[in-house]
């Protein structure tokens, strides 16, 4: 990741590559925009032969189907027990929210069935890893700080036993928040706590 950031700053990529990477940076972390583009890509495949090679490859990777929701979206999912055993925040993500919403829904069902109250925070769109991996560190840090503030405020006001991720890349990034802000006086304490609370669903 340090290497990507260095390359992004020091190496001038070809114009077409810069445009493509900016496009990814501005669309993938935004679920509504990404969903619209996935739907649009179904029609765009008709004209795929007219597109640049990089765009054709991306069209081939676009999901063939967008799964419908089977669980009504809400901010709080109550535990299926009188006394909840824990209260957690679920990172519903950006790309996964569109491509595989059933993973989040299954996670919620399993947790609530076992007595865990689950909250979702729509304001947390992306963990920041997409821009982080693209070497766009300024945009990534905007997401990191926004998420840290939102979760930390919730932790202080209502309590959180964990922040759950069911996407390995996102989970790794959340656990790195503490390290990323270790020299930031304002965010050091908050980032460390968020990393400590972060758990993969398998944990």
Residue ranges of each PLM-predicted region?
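Iron-sulfur cluster-binding electron-transfer modules in prokaryotic oxidoreductases
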Residues: 2-203
């Amino acid at each position: 990741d340090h290497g990507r950031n260095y390359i992004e700053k020091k190496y001038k990529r070809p114009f077409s590559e810069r445009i493509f990477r900016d496009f990814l940076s501005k669309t993938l972390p935004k679920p509504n925009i990404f969903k619209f583009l996935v739907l649009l890509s179904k029609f765009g495949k008709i004209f795929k032969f007219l597109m640049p090679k990089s765009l054709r490859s991306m069209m081939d990777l676009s999901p063939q189907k967008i799964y419908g929701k089977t669980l009504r979206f809400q901010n709080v999912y109550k535990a299926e027990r009188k006394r909840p055993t824990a209260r957690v925040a679920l990172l519903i993500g950006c790309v996964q929210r569109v491509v595989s919403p059933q993973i989040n829904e299954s996670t919620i069902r399993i947790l609530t069935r076992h007595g865990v109250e689950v909250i979702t925070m729509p304001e947390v769109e992306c963990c920041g890893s997409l821009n982080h991996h693209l070497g766009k560190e300024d945009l990534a840090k905007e997401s990191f700080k926004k998420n840290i503030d939102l979760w930390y405020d919730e932790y202080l006001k209502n309590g959180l036993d964990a922040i759950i991720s069911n996407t390995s890349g996102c989970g790794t990034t959340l656990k790195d928040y503490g390290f990323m802000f270790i020299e930031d006086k304002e965010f050091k304490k908050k980032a460390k706590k968020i990393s400590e609370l972060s758990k993969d669903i398998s944990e």
